[in-house]
Amino acid sequence: MSSNTVAQFATELKMPANVLLEQLRAAGVDLKSVDDAVTDSDKAKLLESLRRAHGATEGKKITLTRRQTSEIRQADATGRSRTIQVEVRKKRVFVKRDPAELAAEQAAARAEEAAAEAVPAEAAPAPAEPVRAEPAVETAAKPVEPPVAEAPAEPVAAPAAEPQSEQPAQAEAQPEPTPAAQAEPEPQPEPQPEAAPAQAVAEPVEPAKNVSVTETEAEQARPEPVVHAQTELTSKTPAPVAQPSAPAESPKSAKAEPAAAPKTTAKPGEIRRAAAPAAPDRAREEARRAAEAEAAALREMLSRPRKVLRAPEPEPQAGALSGTLHKPAGKPATTAAPKKDAKPGAPGAKKTIKTAEVSSTWSDDSARKKPADNKPAVTTRDGWRAGGKGGRGGRNSRNQHQDRRHEQVQQEFIAREIHVPETISVADLAHKMSVKAAEVIKQLMKLGQMVTINQVLDQETAMIVVQEFGHMAIAAKLDDPEAFLDETAAVTEAEAEPRAPVVTVMGHVDHGKTSLLDYIRRAKVASGEAGGITQHIGAYHVETGRGVVTFLDTPGHEAFTAMRARGAKATDIVILVVAADDGVMPQTREAIHHAKAGGVPLVVAVNKIDKPEANPERVKQELVAEEVVPEEYGGDVPFVPVSAKTGAGIDDLLENVLLQAEILELKAPIEAPAKGLVIEARLDKGRGPVATILVQSGTLKRGDVVLAGASFGRVRAMLDENGKQIQTAGPSIPVEIQGLTEVPAAGDELMVLSDERKAREIALFRQGKFRDVKLARQQAAKLESMFDNLGEGTQTLALIVKTDVQGSQEALVSSLTKLSTDEVRVQVVHAAVGGISESDVNLAIASNAVVIGFNVRAEQSAKKLAETNGIDLRYYNIIYDAVDEVKAAMSGMLAPEKREEVIGLVEVREVYTISRIGTVAGCMVLDGVVRRDSQVRLLRNNVVQWTGHLDSLRRFKDDVKEVKSGFDCGLTLRGNNDLQLGDQLEVFEIKEIARTL
């Protein structure tokens, strides 16, 4: 007897081993663990136990519903095509008949067929019995559906799946020998022909499906679904289960059967004559069994969606017609053989093939084999049997099957955790949620947002969409390469050493900041500034007798707020320069706020004390009001009177600065990768992007790979503030580097990385992130401001700004944008660093913009293009001039103000009524002048009665343009004849006055 362990048996049944062990123990099988052996008799006991347990609760009726959704396009009343969803629902009910009634009918059928048998049936099922008992156990062990099979024997069960063909069943009934009747308690003569195909299933190879299996799989696992389906299709007689005690034939006897079969083959004519009397009754029986077969197969499919192997087509039919029943026993039978051997006129050949396919191809995998001549019927888990060629399924059955399968996938909803980055496209969001992009777009449309599949969503919107779909949204930064920077910073910790202080000179414009630095550096810097004002951050380091000091000179003009903030961020000490003759000014207060916000100590330099009108005491009082208290008043801020012209007090100032530096104990690691801050950046035509860097820690070397914001590169050249090449730069040293891929933003942090590939990855990540965030914000702004300007006469002044350095661009754009009013809005279409190129002029043509160049000039080709298209190019080197001219241009775009001016007064002294003309007034001009095109007000008793225009003005008989004071005239009013003696006419004009910002 064949045996295997509980664990192996559970693997075959695809169920947990411990559950199977409990079921075996409940059936009375004494097993200790999952490693114990299971015999065929144990399996039979398990099958009997499960049938007893599930038989009482077996359902009598199965109701199947099918829903199919399709779309049609139909034109509406306006002629536009609309898509309409059409849903078709169908229901089918299968009723299980009473087993007693079926048993009676089967007994009568067996009696009729026994008389028709001339030759004993072939005893093929015996060796397959033990093998088939195991699959029966497997099907019964599945608690998904109680087993319907109550038939006694598997060989008998197999033919029941082919009730439609009557003739072939009789044709195969003849060659069966009688041992089948001895082996089974209740043999059924009609279904016997299927025994040979069922045995062929147990062969090692199943070529009908092009599936290669081992002998064990073929004997135990593969026949299982077929047998289960067949047992369900048999009549429900309460006969005993297939006997495990039946002798198991050796492989030799199993292979010898096909050779012996041809000797007992009967002629086709005899078979038909013997079957003729029972034909009417059998037709009814076959029709009933066909319905039962379909219901049982549907139950099998619904309970166990496993891949099913088809039983091969019965060989004896082909043999009866061609003289050969089987191929040699060594070769497994194939389903294609009967088709080749059968003649076109052979009775029942085609029908047998069809019924065999119907009974043995219940599978959910519709794409597992190539289509044959007769397409097998396929049943899906959520639909009915889709007929093959010529069946109910039709050509669209495969598409319908795919639609049904897709519907089922949608029904199985699984809530997931969706990580939503800062920006994500609609397509990516749909992919993360495993839904179609169209569903996401539909949901966004419900939320009031019209999007496309590639549109970028911001994080908040994407999280709302995820929650609408029932998933859990988590705001996250996945795969952020910047995490690498934190790891690098943690690893590269070095010993800190003393460093030079970084001192920022701040103050109001024209208070002498640069002149003070000029004296300290002994170099003429201020004379080279345009307009005598600083428009860049200058970085210098000075060697004094007490050490090195690095100075940053910031602009004082109000436009350079961001630059001053950057200067305070990068600095250790702030020198606040205040003119002794001018006192505290707005930018002085702003510098104090920047210093306090950064927690930076202040040193006040009261400049211009050499002037006669200097008043240092007034400056002290004003600074005390700003909470900057001098040391002599009990505060902590040193006050040093200096003169940038004579040099008085400069040494005291430096001494105070170095004293503050000693108190701060400034330290930084030197032997470490450099980190710094981008002070300024520009695009040089010959050298490319150039950045001024203040090294804050570590040592920057020539050839280092650096990352600055969204740009990266290798340091190709390094210059100090005097333009000399240097190889290294330590902490607190300002340098100018070349070799970056693009111009970084001023204020970006710079750091040295060991891996250029990683630097490129982080830079590209930052670029994409910046672009996505910018686009998402623009989209949100568009949606919010869509109706803001609707109906308003808002005018827009478009500008393209090109500057020499990043800081100037930032300051200029900020200043120009602040000029916007409710009526005229300044729109900076494009702002960048570098000269004015042809592409800038093309952009100006497209957007009708004015091009502003700040310390830059246009290329020759750009100049010609601008002249040809009438584009206005403006060059400036002082920020005041640029702001003032843009303000003047905006004033010209403002709607003029209309004012009313009274120019004369007329009194009515005579009134004449003339036909075809109307009422004519004879008047005297009392004051001013009356003009023909003027407007008038009719005054009666000093109350305004009417306002309008003069229709005509005459003096005597002549039309005149105007009549001055002291002269009489005749006039008519346009659209008004109500004139009386004593009325007065007030003559006025409306003048337009240009407005200014």
Swiss-Prot record:
Stored CDD domains: IF2_eIF5B (cd01887), IF2_mtIF2_II (cd03702), mtIF2_IVc (cd03692)
MF term (GO), any: GTP binding
Matches recorded under Pfam families: EF-G_D2, GTP_EFTU, GTP_EFTU_D2, IF-2, IF2_assoc, IF2_N
Basic and acidic residues bias (residue ranges): 281-292, 400-409
Any one annotated GO CC term: cytosol
Coiled coil: none
Chain residue ranges for the region called G5: 643-645
Ranges of Low complexity composition bias in the record: 116-185, 195-208, 244-280
Main location (coarse class): cytoplasm
Region feature (G4): 607-610
Binding residues annotated for GTP, in chain numbering: 507-514, 553-557, 607-610
Region feature G3, mapped onto this chain: 553-556
Record-annotated tr-type G domain positions: 498-665
Sequence ranges of Gly residues compositional bias: 385-394
The keyword Cell division is assigned to this record: no
Sorted UniProt keywords: Cytoplasm, GTP-binding, Initiation factor, Nucleotide-binding, Protein biosynthesis
UniProt xrefs under HAMAP family: IF_2_B (MF_00100_B)
Family from the record: Belongs to the TRAFAC class translation factor GTPase superfamily. Classic translation factor GTPase family. IF-2 subfamily.
Protein role: One of the essential components for the initiation of protein synthesis. Protects formylmethionyl-tRNA from spontaneous hydrolysis and promotes its binding to the 30S ribosomal subunits. Also involved in the hydrolysis of GTP during the formation of the 70S ribosomal complex.
Name this polypeptide is given: Translation initiation factor IF-2
Species, as recorded: Bordetella bronchiseptica (strain ATCC BAA-588 / NCTC 13252 / RB50) (Alcaligenes bronchisepticus)
Gene from which this protein is expressed: infB
